[in-house]
């Protein structure tokens, strides 16, 4: 098939230009220019040329009438602009312009402002690039705060936006990979390379001046809110970029990461503690917007909209706004969107429904004389009807709600008190539901019980109250102990543990006596570290005493304690060291006291990777070893080392956590004055 058949040539004719001149307003009498197309090639020229005259005429008429618009057209443009402003989202319409309009606590604003002044305005030359990490829940004003403060301080903001990759079609691949094509590789650049190139260019060159921008200052920051997805798969690439920026960077780098309690802890994955210390990363954590601040912000929006468009919207009352603030969980963006959606006029409007529901509920309350319970039920329904978010709690706050167990005072209208023989179990009504609290924490029930067991003692005032509390925790452990029924009884086990601990604390059983509401720190459970030590001891016992053919549990509980008391010669120093570590208890005051690691308010709970559950911060991958987190260190050793005969093993074959022979000798010398020496003869092959 010839090429001329595929691409027919158009005869040399004059074709009108389909692009209107840019300066057509200044030359009203100038005719439309024409071009001579001698060899113009179209794939479908006749089809395209068919629509040229109408397009030309419309462009020519619009160009001539561009300068003179009638009054009706001017009024129509103004009307269209008003419609656009009415349909504009309230989040964009009422966005803050100054720091006084921010719905953020003043201390957080001062922290960000102080950091910007110190790292941007007062920075020394050749100091290197600094890094700021801003964290907080969604909708708490992180990005808005940094942009407004930068604007007021005269600092430019260069923001990274993830580029949209071009969509390659099937024909594009055919053309690129054809034999006649000059290049056989599809043009592509990785996200990490694009991000690294952006940082280098932003550090080296100034920002381009757009319409309305003021570039009178050379001070600037680089804002990164949307990180490339590749960094979540390979965090080490981001860490290398941070190290390089700290060394050669000229302007500060600001990262914004939203908190998540559903398992995706991006802050811990992308910015671990060692990287923050190495690169001197400053961390500012934002809190959810307080209900009082949010109420003021929503009242201002309602007042402005009622004065401008009072006939087009339904103005909510104070009670509805309070319910809206409770349902948004501190997310002011979600609250404003819900307010705009609910205030729209119509028969199915949510505010009109709530008014009818409130009238019906008032009538029901007056008849049943149970005002409090009905109001609480109605509040939950209204919060969900407004469009409230799913409330989530960090583990720190969830444990606090269980351990402090705040209660509401009972009134005469409530249910009668318990009989006399059950008066010791009389308590006021709880303000929270324990099962809902555990569900909001996104933590499995058995692991939540571990954190509860680690911290519940400090919240009890009487020893007698600890007895039933420990019994409830034991019952909960029995319910979840059998692996065959663990999946079915896990929720019941958590209910027994949480409700049992809350009920056993008599000092906090009533609203008027809260047992001291002072702050008490929370700690991570020591169970993880003990389990790690136990597994390492089992592996070491099996390897060092393989001749006895006993399980690891029998070795450590039955055989080794007796070997420490007998004068049986051992074959090497590793066996001696292990027996001294496991077979006897040292008489030291600090024995058994492990270091407790504090639980921070924004930290996710640790989950044992060996229990079959995936760690919430690993995204399905094996969790990295951390303090207090179990790890199979002994299993990573060389298997050939454990299979060697005991006579060829040495003390270096033990796991890192096991004491070495030299350290054990020092311990024996320290304890000679307190107890009798234990004589363990070394094996001598010459005597036999």
From Swiss-Prot:
Biased composition annotated in UniProt, kind: Polar residues: 644-663
Record-level GO cellular component terms: chromosome, telomeric region; nucleolus; nucleoplasm; Rad17 RFC-like complex; site of double-strand break
Pfam families: Rad17
Entry comment on modification after translation: Phosphorylated. Phosphorylation on Ser-647 and Ser-657 is cell cycle-regulated, enhanced by genotoxic stress, and required for activation of checkpoint signaling. Phosphorylation is mediated by ATR upon UV or replication arrest, whereas it may be mediated both by ATR and ATM upon ionizing radiation. Phosphorylation on both sites is required for interaction with RAD1 but dispensable for interaction with RFC3 or RFC4. Phosphorylation by ATM in response to DNA damage promotes interaction with NBN and recruitment of the MRN complex to DNA damage sites.
Name recorded for this polypeptide: Cell cycle checkpoint protein RAD17
Acidic residues biased stretches: 668-688
Region (Interaction with MCM7): 431-688
Species: Mus musculus (Mouse)
Reported consequences of knocking out the gene: Mice show numerous defects in embryonic development, starting at E8.5.
Gene Ontology process terms (BP): DNA damage response; DNA repair; mitotic intra-S DNA damage checkpoint signaling; negative regulation of DNA replication; protein localization to site of double-strand break
Tissue specificity remark: Ubiquitous at low levels. Highly expressed in testis, where it is expressed in spermatogonia, spermatocytes and spermatids, but absent in mature spermatozoa (at protein level).
SMART domains: AAA
Region annotation Disordered: where it falls in the sequence: 63-84, 342-379, 605-688
Self-association state and partner proteins as the record states: Part of a DNA-binding complex containing RFC2, RFC3, RFC4 and RFC5. Interacts with RAD1 and RAD9 within the 9-1-1 (RAD1-RAD9-HUS1) complex. Interacts with RAD9B, POLE, SNU13 and MCM7. DNA damage promotes interaction with ATR or ATM and disrupts interaction with the 9-1-1 (RAD1-RAD9-HUS1) complex. Interacts (when phosphorylated) with NBN; promoting recruitment of the MRN complex to DNA damage sites.
Modified sites of kind Phosphothreonine: 55
Family: Belongs to the rad17/RAD24 family.
InterPro entries recorded: AAA+_ATPase, Checkpoint_prot_Rad17_Rad24, P-loop_NTPase, Rad17/Rad24_fun/met
Motif (RAD1-binding motif): 17-25
Localization (cell): Nucleus; Chromosome
Record-linked SUPFAM superfamilies: P-loop containing nucleoside triphosphate hydrolases
Gene, per the UniProt record: Rad17
Low complexity: compositionally biased ranges: 342-351, 619-635
Phosphoserine sites (modified residues): 85, 358, 647, 657
GO molecular function, one term: DNA clamp loader activity
Residue sites binding ATP per the record: 136-143
Keywords noted in UniProt: ATP-binding, Cell cycle, Chromosome, Developmental protein, DNA damage, Nucleotide-binding, Nucleus, Phosphoprotein
